[in-house]
């Protein structure tokens, strides 16, 4: 590649661009990520120019063949973008000029870098959305499989990080399934707004050349076409919406990771994360750290930062295009890659995580989380719920003070709190009975969980 770096816009200026200013403004180290999208967009644009007789067919052929060769050069590493090229668009056009001469300049007929980069970004977003949706599909599949495998395993359900009520482990996994299903729906809905071609808007006011924007749209397989050329190049709301969707996905992963970190700790000891997804300590030999889960939790903050960066970049920009928008690429690329890789590694880790069923079974059977069953037992005996709650609270205090458990407390002792208690109370205090007593829609009963599993499989 030639050592002389030509800036595409420099002819109007009498002094060369300051070298340090060029280094400061160069984005090629970041936007080289878009080289495939940029070449795809250029090939479509040149094809349209040829079909509309704006450039000769033979010149279009040379340009397209040159672009295809450049794509191969970049992908194999034989063409390495340099910061002096300013951006990936300049890298490609300068290399094309080296290959085919001055006719390379016709690639930009009727096109600005404004609609060029807007097109590249939308193509990148379409690909990113599909990749993350595929990763979510794989995660949802594992969640349903886990729900089915553990549908009759009883664990603690928590509120305020306090043991609350016994639930089916399958019910727990399906809760996260539904969260990630909504994440998928958000991306699916966003795709419709991304799938709109901005090519043909030029700088922002359109072009005097007889461009066929509809043909460019079809060649690039966009569903829709921009309505307003200013809007087409000057907003980045689709990036903000995408990074927001990524932030919500990461938030759900982070909450899930927190559960796994806590539940795999010695203090909880409810589940086992495979050694393949844990690390040890360089000084404490006994340690097994849930590092992958912790990293997912930590990377969530990065994606939140990407969202804040995008909102801040755009908040004060007048119409239409401003160079500030160059700074949309780092948060976009980081959010996309971080979210995709986090979903994928979390899926692998979850697939290799197992619940300690025997330990949980013994813990749940004697736990105070069965107290709600006592209150509802009294309600079924026609006691007002507030009174039942008060009576049960006193029973819980007695159990704590006496060191007994709810199932082990005698009927005689129960009757000191209310004469409504009878032998059938002990049936209600069995964890499986507690779980299966739930009658409402979407609840934790085994029958309800099995229905939810069937429904979930249709939504993978």
From Swiss-Prot:
<comment type="similarity">
    <text>Belongs to the lyase 1 family. Argininosuccinate lyase subfamily.</text>
</comment>
<dbReference type="GO" id="GO:0042450">
    <property type="term" value="P:arginine biosynthetic process via ornithine"/>
</dbReference>
<dbReference type="GO" id="GO:0004056">
    <property type="term" value="F:argininosuccinate lyase activity"/>
</dbReference>
<dbReference type="Pfam" id="PF00206">
    <property type="entry name" value="Lyase_1"/>
</dbReference>
<dbReference type="InterPro" id="IPR020557">
    <property type="entry name" value="Fumarate_lyase_CS"/>
</dbReference>
<keyword id="KW-0028">Amino-acid biosynthesis</keyword>
<dbReference type="InterPro" id="IPR024083">
    <property type="entry name" value="Fumarase/histidase_N"/>
</dbReference>
<dbReference type="Pfam" id="PF14698">
    <property type="entry name" value="ASL_C2"/>
</dbReference>
<keyword id="KW-0963">Cytoplasm</keyword>
<keyword id="KW-0456">Lyase</keyword>
<dbReference type="InterPro" id="IPR029419">
    <property type="entry name" value="Arg_succ_lyase_C"/>
</dbReference>
<dbReference type="InterPro" id="IPR000362">
    <property type="entry name" value="Fumarate_lyase_fam"/>
</dbReference>
<comment type="pathway">
    <text>Amino-acid biosynthesis; L-arginine biosynthesis; L-arginine from L-ornithine and carbamoyl phosphate: step 3/3.</text>
</comment>
<keyword id="KW-0055">Arginine biosynthesis</keyword>
<dbReference type="InterPro" id="IPR009049">
    <property type="entry name" value="Argininosuccinate_lyase"/>
</dbReference>
<dbReference type="InterPro" id="IPR022761">
    <property type="entry name" value="Fumarate_lyase_N"/>
</dbReference>
<dbReference type="GO" id="GO:0005829">
    <property type="term" value="C:cytosol"/>
</dbReference>
<protein>
    <recommendedName>
        <fullName>Argininosuccinate lyase</fullName>
        <ecNumber>4.3.2.1</ecNumber>
    </recommendedName>
</protein>
<dbReference type="InterPro" id="IPR008948">
    <property type="entry name" value="L-Aspartase-like"/>
</dbReference>
<dbReference type="GO" id="GO:0006526">
    <property type="term" value="P:L-arginine biosynthetic process"/>
</dbReference>
């Amino acid at each position: 590649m030639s050592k002389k770096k030509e800036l595409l816009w420099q002819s109007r200026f009498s002094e060369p661009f300051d070298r340090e200013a060029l280094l400061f403004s160069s984005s090629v180290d970041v936007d080289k990520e878009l080289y495939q999208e940029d070449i795809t967009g250029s090939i479509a644009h040149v094809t349209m120019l040829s079909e509309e007789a704006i450039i000769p067919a033979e010149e279009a052929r040379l340009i397209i063949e040159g672009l295809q060769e450049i794509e191969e050069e970049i992908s194999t590493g034989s063409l390495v973008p340099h910061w002096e090229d300013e951006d990936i668009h300049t890298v490609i056009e300068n290399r094309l000029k080296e290959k085919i001469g001055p006719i390379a300049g016709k690639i930009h007929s009727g096109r600005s870098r404004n609609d060029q980069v807007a097109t590249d970004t939308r193509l990148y977003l379409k690909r990113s959305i599909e990749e993350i949706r595929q990763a979510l599909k794989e995660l949802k599949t594992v969640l349903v499989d886990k729900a089915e495998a553990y549908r009759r395993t009883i664990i603690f359900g928590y509120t305020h990080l306090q043991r609350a009520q016994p639930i089916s482990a399958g019910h727990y996994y399906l809760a996260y399934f539904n969260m990630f299903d909504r994440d998928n729906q958000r991306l699916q809905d966003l795709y419709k707004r991304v799938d709109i071609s901005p090519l043909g808007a030029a700088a922002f006011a359109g072009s005097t050349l007889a461009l066929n924007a509809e043909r460019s749209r079809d060649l690039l397989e966009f569903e829709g076409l921009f309505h307003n050329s200013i809007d087409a190049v000057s907003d980045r709301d689709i990036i903000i919406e995408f990074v927001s969707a990524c932030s919500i996905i990461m938030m759900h992963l982070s909450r899930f990771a927190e559960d796994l970190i806590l539940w795999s700790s010695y203090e909880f000891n409810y589940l086992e994360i495979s050694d393949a997804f844990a690390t040890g300590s360089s000084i404490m030999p006994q340690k097994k750290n849930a590092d992958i889960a912790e990293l997912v939790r930590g990377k969530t903050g990065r994606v939140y930062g990407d969202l804040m960066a995008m909102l801040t970049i755009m908040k004060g920009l007048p119409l239409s295009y401003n160079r500030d928008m160059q700074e949309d690429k780092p948060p976009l690329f980081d959010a996309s890659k971080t979210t995709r890789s986090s979903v994928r590694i979390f899926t692998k880790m979850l697939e290799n995580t197992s619940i300690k069923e025997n330990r949980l079974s013994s813990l749940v059977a004697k736990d105070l989380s069965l107290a709600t069953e006592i209150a509802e037992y009294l309600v079924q005996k026609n006691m007002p719920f507030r009174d039942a709650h008060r009576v049960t609270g006193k029973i819980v205090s007695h159990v704590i003070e006496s060191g007994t458990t709810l199932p082990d407390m005698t009927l005689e002792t129960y009757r000191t709190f209310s004469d409504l208690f009878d032998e059938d109370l002990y049936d209600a205090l069995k964890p499986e009975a507690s779980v299966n007593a739930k009658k409402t829609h979407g609840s934790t009963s085994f029958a309800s969980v099995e229905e939810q599993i069937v429904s979930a499989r249709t939504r993978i």
